[in-house]
Amino acid sequence: MLQFSKYQGLGNDFLILEGRRAALPGDVVEPDPAWVRQLCDRRFGIGGDGVILALPPEQQGDLRMRIFNADGTEAEMCGNGIRCLARFLADSDGDSAGRRWSIETPAGLIRPELQQDGQLLVDMGAPFLEPSSIPTTLPLVDGLARGTVELADTSLDVAAVGMGNPHVVIPVEDLSSIPFERWGAALEVHPAFPAKTNVHFLQVHARDRLEIRVWERGAGPTLACGTGACATLVAAVLLGLADDQAEVMLPGGPLQIAWPGCSGSVLMTGPAVAVFDGVLSPDLLPAPLDPMSFAAPAAVETAQGNISFECARDCVDACQQPDNCLRDAAQQQVQAFLNSTSLDAMLNLASESLEQRTRSRFDRDIR
């Protein structure tokens, strides 16, 4: 069986799969985008804005993170996602305030730290301001990639900032008066952003109080975006609209963002909360199923003799071993477990690790 944990940061929710100690199946580590879309579907799957894999490190980090958007595409980084992963690590490993992790991501090494109040302070690294690093075709003007973008029905003055992933920030007078979804969808795929982009509409309430609405690349409207809040502050500072520290309000709640001295790393502080643990049903397992995830043999004895055989490699179009199918055997094992286990027992099994983590956290808070 494949267990998962669901966490959310300001309503931006993720399914986390633990693979630091026990190897995840190959079909999970390199997931089919269709499987990710199925998991994230809020009607026919579990529901989420993305899937996070916690994996062994490849370099000098404590672990490695891969994150996939709800549309199945892989993202370089996600601020809310990395806070959720850090909260998961703290809950799973019994860590206390002051614990700091070095997490490898495609955007570089990111370092979240657990605070005394349970929030996560994340060193997000320095912003990317050169157009080629974002990437964008917008010109660099006074240290910021910016210009006018033409849409079908309007022209918008925009600024682009990279936080390991691309962002475009559009200052507006009133967030409630813009055609958010139409402009957001158009800007995400605009030719000025060759890798597509996350889109943030910004209303400035005060130099230390900003408000944004988020159109996330690969996910659409979302309640929050941590890297987007960081990119927004950087753009607002360079446009002369904000100080180097501000509260950034999102539909899901506020984040505290700082860019000390307008140079070096951007710092993000915000919450992350456990929602529930679960076990994927056979219908939600990736297909073709990697037999190693169920400790089935990697090779099967066939009528022709000893032939190495792998479902994931050889059964792409149809089962090649109908009389001795590893996938069927694995599904039968799962089905036998489901048939022989009461609903209460399954619920207890699915919630046990979350209960243990929650109890440990409460014990630490009391101490």
What are these regions (language model features)?
Residues 145-177:
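Internal active-site segments that recognize and position negatively charged phosphoryl groups
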Residues 123, 157-162, 268-269:
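Active-site-proximal beta-strand elements of phosphoester/diester hydrolases
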Residues 75, 125, 132-136, 171:
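Flexible, glycine/proline-enriched loop segments at strand-loop-helix junctions
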Residues 128-156:
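Active-site glycine-rich loop that binds ribose-phosphate moieties when present
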Residues 292-367:
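Cysteine-centered metal-binding/redox modules
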Residues 117-122, 127:
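Transmembrane helix-loop-helix hairpins in multi-pass inner-membrane proteins
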Residues 1-117, 168-292:
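A glycine-rich beta-to-alpha transition motif near the start of alpha/beta enzyme domains, typified by
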